[in-house]
Amino acid sequence: MLNVSEYFDGKVKSIGFESASAGRASVGVMAEGEYTFATAQAEEMTVVSGSLKVLLTGETDWKWYQAGEAFNVPGHSEFYLQVAEPTAYLCRYLKD
C-alpha cells in the first residue's frame, strides 16, 4: 500500500511504501528551501537527483550530498536541510 504525505505547505512530498528489497521506505521530492525534520527511528537518506546541504544534530559543520550519495540520521533526533534546487530522495527506515 502506498502512503502519500505532504509537508511544509506542499514543498516536500513523499510516497511511503514497503518492499522486500528496501524494507520500509519513502521516496519524495523537496522544493528549494530550508527544512527541519525529526526522526522516530534511524534513517538512511539517499539523494536520487539534485543535492542536499545537511546538518545532523550534534554536528557543527554542514555537509553537501550529491545524487548517488547517502547519509544516516540517528533515531529520535532532528536534522536540518538546505535545498538549493528541486531534489529527489529515497529514505529507508532502519532498525535502531
Swiss-Prot record:
Signal peptide segment: none
**Keyword Glycosyltransferase, does the record have it?**
yes
Question: What are the protein's UniProt keywords?
Answer: Glycosyltransferase, Transferase
Instruction: Kindly state which reaction or reactions the protein catalyses.
Output: a purine D-ribonucleoside + phosphate = a purine nucleobase + alpha-D-ribose 1-phosphate; adenosine + phosphate = alpha-D-ribose 1-phosphate + adenine; cytidine + phosphate = cytosine + alpha-D-ribose 1-phosphate; guanosine + phosphate = alpha-D-ribose 1-phosphate + guanine
Q: Is Acetylation found in the keyword set?
A: no
Q: Per its record, what are the GO molecular function terms?
A: guanosine phosphorylase activity; purine-nucleoside phosphorylase activity; thymidine phosphorylase activity; uridine phosphorylase activity
Record SUPFAM superfamilies: RmlC-like cupins
GO CC terms on record?
cytosol
Q: Which Pfam families match?
A: Ppnp (PF06865)
User: What EC number(s) does this enzyme carry?
Assistant: 2.4.2.1, 2.4.2.2
The protein's role, per its UniProt record: Catalyzes the phosphorolysis of diverse nucleosides, yielding D-ribose 1-phosphate and the respective free bases. Can use uridine, adenosine, guanosine, cytidine, thymidine, inosine and xanthosine as substrates. Also catalyzes the reverse reactions.
Q: Which NCBIfam families match?
A: PRK10579.1
Say which family it is in: Belongs to the nucleoside phosphorylase PpnP family.
Protein name stated in the entry: Pyrimidine/purine nucleoside phosphorylase
Q: Which organism is it from?
A: Erwinia tasmaniensis (strain DSM 17950 / CFBP 7177 / CIP 109463 / NCPPB 4357 / Et1/99)
Q: Which gene encodes it?
A: ppnP
